């Protein structure tokens, strides 16, 4: 009987605790939604993305380059000078990310890095650019030499 009463009391306590926390969670969720809505209201179309061809080779040294893929993919290959911060961890490790210099973030294709970049922008980083097409397109376009290749390309008639 004591076990049943103890379980019932524990369940009641848990239920009351969750009920009391629900309003605070709802307020936090509403605040987060308001913050995202405010960001989306004023962000430039395409302002957060950059193509590999738009980055001159010398500019990489002036940026913090974040590889948002997992550690195994980063170990296999990455943009020279990049640091590995998995896309889910950018806010948890935001103290490592400067606000006073350009930040380039990429993943394999650009989709996960776009989420990480969005989170950083909403959190106050207005210096973040997402590498359009990710690491795969960066490699396909010539890597560090993508800008030079694009500048030297002749239009086909």
Ranges and model annotations:
Residues 2-7, 11, 22-53, 60-63, ...:
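Rhodanese-like catalytic fold shared by cysteine-dependent sulfurtransferases
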Residues 15-21:
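Residues within alpha-helical transmembrane segments of multi-pass membrane proteins, especially transporters
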Residues 66:
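Active-site flanking residues adjacent to catalytic metal/cofactor-binding acidic residues
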């Amino acid at each position: 009987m004591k076990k049943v009463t103890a379980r019932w009391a524990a369940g009641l306590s848990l239920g009351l605790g969750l009920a009391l926390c629900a309003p605070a969670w709802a307020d936090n969720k509403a605040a987060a939604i308001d913050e995202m809505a405010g960001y989306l209201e004023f962000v430039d179309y395409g302002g957060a993305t950059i193509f590999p061809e738009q980055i001159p080779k010398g500019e990489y040294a002036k940026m913090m380059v974040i590889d948002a893929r997992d550690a195994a993919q980063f170990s296999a290959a990455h943009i020279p000078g990049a640091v590995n911060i998995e896309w889910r961890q950018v806010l948890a490790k935001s103290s490592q990310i400067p606000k006073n210099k350009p930040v380039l973030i990429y993943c394999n294709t650009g989709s996960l890095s776009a989420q990480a970049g969005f989170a950083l922008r909403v959190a106050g980083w207005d210096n973040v650019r997402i590498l359009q097409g990710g690491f795969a397109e960066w490699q396909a376009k010539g890597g560090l030499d993508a800008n030079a290749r694009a500048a030297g390309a002749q239009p086909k008639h």
